[in-house]
């Protein structure tokens, strides 16, 4: 941790170590330095000069490779338009550092830690380098406790661990960002501590929507910014790959400060971790590395590990991380989601089949997993209910081929009952979201874990066999389902 702003470092003695650009390939630059003056890997370089139109250029780069012959290869964190061979490059002598602490709350930053919300500069009294080692094994905390989200399907079938890493896996358009925004709404508001949101390579519109949503809900307090509870770090789709590759580390560095120095419990939301891998792949190819499986970078597992291992709980505080993971072509065996799976304590898998049925959130309870779903952690009642729900849904899945060919009438009495209950369970797993109120017209519902377990127990036991399955669709707790059934009966 250093208390000097980065600008001060650049303007003093280190400026003597200057080089010049020898080659530009898209976002990648080759820079020559004097013999014996090569910068270290991950050092931050600054290109200063003027483009042909006479405009000032100030581009920050990060050293990726040492090429020999006193040359290094660096990746730019902003557009390389206007850069020319021969331009002066200054070695800052340190990795990229970003502002940390309370000054970041309520503000939006880019990958360099510069505010981009037009609210003026940040007083960066304390900055921290984005490249660090993971906490030592002896510092890690091993307490196990559940993080209640208020979303039925998540809390029941794949509960989240406090201080754990959670992956939201899904293809294009199945609802990952809506789910992550609902989790921010339910958890960040109720959560006393601070949150950090890293927008990695996603749509600018979604970043804007999230910012407006947070201002409305007072998670960002515009009247008194210092009372805000969240810091936002954006490196959106239109940014060069260098920025998208490092913006996750910028967000993580801000979260680590709250954990290690302020000793707080922090929430870290990342949307989307796949874009971090994708940007790494672009940089790797531009740097001339041989691609690995499916065209990904050969260092995929190392890059993912160096990010994920820093997201952990220590004896000082915790970081609970919720990460959206895009699944290319709905293929969970693709190297990017498959590598992310290995780091997750809980996986929430979104299904296109459920989304097509109109069941939102489209979370598949059979594919979703959690290390927390053990009877000695969640209790016998929760465990038995979750297993009962999964068994019923699995049996329904097995019977679907028979139903498609022969029809429901050919099933045994017991199987017909299983199908009826499974269809009720499937619909009861849907839930109206607060963040989707403007689209659906239905008010959002937060359902406590106790109410969730009670509702599914009643369906499994057969108490609600007489109610129509439509009564269970898009409701909160089980009392709302029975009330909806009564309304449907009156209408019919």
From Swiss-Prot:
InterPro entries: AAA+_ATPase, ATP-synt_VA_C, ATP_synth_F1_bsu, ATPase_a/bsu_AS, ATPase_alpha/beta_chains, ATPase_F1/V1/A1_a/bsu_N, ATPase_F1/V1/A1_a/bsu_N_sf, ATPase_F1/V1/A1_a/bsu_nucl-bd. It catalyses: ATP + H2O + 4 H(+)(in) = ADP + phosphate + 5 H(+)(out). SUPFAM superfamilies: C-terminal domain of alpha and beta subunits of F1 ATP synthase (SSF47917), N-terminal domain of alpha and beta subunits of F1 ATP synthase (SSF50615), P-loop containing nucleoside triphosphate hydrolases (SSF52540). The keyword Aminoacyl-tRNA synthetase does not apply. Gene3D superfamilies: 2.40.10.170, Bovine Mitochondrial F1-atpase, Atp Synthase Beta Chain, Chain D, domain 3 (1.10.1140.10), P-loop containing nucleotide triphosphate hydrolases (3.40.50.300). GO terms for cellular component: chloroplast thylakoid membrane; mitochondrion; proton-transporting ATP synthase complex. GO terms for biological process: proton motive force-driven mitochondrial ATP synthesis. It holds the Pfam family ATP-synt_ab_N. Keywords: ATP synthesis, ATP-binding, CF(1), Chloroplast, Hydrogen ion transport, Ion transport, Membrane, Nucleotide-binding, Plastid, Thylakoid, Translocase, Transport. ATP binds at residues 170-177. PROSITE patterns: ATPASE_ALPHA_BETA (PS00152). Its EC number is 7.1.2.2. It is found in: Plastid, Chloroplast thylakoid membrane. F-type ATPases have 2 components, CF(1) - the catalytic core - and CF(0) - the membrane proton channel. CF(1) has five subunits: alpha(3), beta(3), gamma(1), delta(1), epsilon(1). CF(0) has four main subunits: a(1), b(1), b'(1) and c(9-12). Belongs to the ATPase alpha/beta chains family. Produces ATP from ADP in the presence of a proton gradient across the membrane. The catalytic sites are hosted primarily by the beta subunits. This is ATP synthase subunit beta, chloroplastic. It comes from Angiopteris evecta (Mule's foot fern).
